[in-house]
């Protein structure tokens, strides 16, 4: 409890400030590349569901054209590649588009490690997360679900992983997730754009339905 309520917050602030200072040159290079590649702002802002169900604006480097659907998850788009810019492809494959969430950490809206925040439009999975107690903690830049399948698993499976994380928050868990995330990013593992259920089945990774998740967790 001490780690979750105090030490984890202090670590987040320290890491966020240090990262912001160290990565300023990287931010500058990415900003120039985005502006050179396509019209639109450097940062993409989107409403997400945060701790205790509070709405907040998440920050990302913009990776899509202005014509892209704003409030639809990428996995629901049949051909997401048509909306992603050339610079955006690089940023998404390397997860560099997530770097601006350092500002969310400084504002106290996000943690380095925690359940990824969902869109407000994803009401069904948000209800499941609230029921599972996941919204009791701050959302994270990376989490247990991200090192156990990321885009390859369904939202319902992510709920299971996120609940497991919330029930077992500790420094060792966070450290393990952090280093495994770095490993996954370097390998570019489990990053699929617009993955459909039938495509998951071809990979032998068919996602569970929400009803099945409810039956397993009643």
Residue ranges of model-derived segments:
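Amphipathic alpha-helical recognition patches that constitute DNA-binding helices
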Residues: 5, 53, 86, 101, ...
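Short, well-ordered beta-strand elements within core beta-sheets of diverse protein domains
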Residues: 87-94, 163-167
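Short, glycine-rich, amphipathic interfacial segments at transmembrane boundaries or analogous
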Residues: 44-83, 141-160
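Hydrophobic structural segments characteristic of membrane proteins
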Residues: 41, 49, 103-218
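Short, conserved beta-strand/loop elements in beta-sheet-dominated catalytic cores
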Residues: 89-111
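Hydrophobic alpha-helix-in-membranes signature
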Residues: 24, 99, 114-116
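A hydrophobic, helix-centered structural microdomain
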Residues: 1-66, 176-218
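Juxtamembrane loop-helix boundary motifs flanking transmembrane segments in multi-pass membrane proteins
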Residues: 2-6, 79-83, 98
């Amino acid at each position: 409890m001490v780690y979750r309520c105090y030490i984890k917050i202090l670590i987040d602030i320290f890491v966020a400030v240090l990262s912001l200072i160290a990565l300023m040159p990287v931010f500058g290079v990415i900003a120039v590349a985005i502006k050179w590649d396509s019209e639109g702002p450097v940062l993409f802002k989107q409403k997400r569901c945060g701790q205790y169900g509070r709405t907040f604006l998440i920050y990302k480097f913009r990776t899509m054209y202005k014509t892209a659907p704003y409030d639809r998850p990428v996995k629901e788009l049949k051909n997401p590649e048509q909306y992603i810019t050339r610079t955006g492809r690089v940023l998404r494959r390397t997860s560099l588009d997530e770097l601006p969430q350092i500002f969310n950490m400084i504002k106290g809206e996000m943690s380095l490690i925690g359940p990824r925040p969902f869109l407000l439009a994803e009401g069904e999975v948000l209800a499941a997360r609230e029921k599972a107690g996941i919204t009791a903690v701050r959302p994270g830049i990376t989490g247990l679900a991200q090192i156990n399948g990321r885009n390859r698993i369904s939202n319902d499976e992510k709920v299971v992983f996120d609940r497991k994380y919330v029930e077992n928050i500790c420094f060792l868990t966070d450290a393990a997730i952090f280093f495994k995330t770095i490993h996954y990013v370097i390998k570019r593992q489990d990053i699929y754009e617009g993955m459909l259920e039938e495509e998951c089945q071809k990979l032998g990774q068919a996602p569970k339905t929400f009803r099945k998740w409810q039956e397993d967790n009643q």
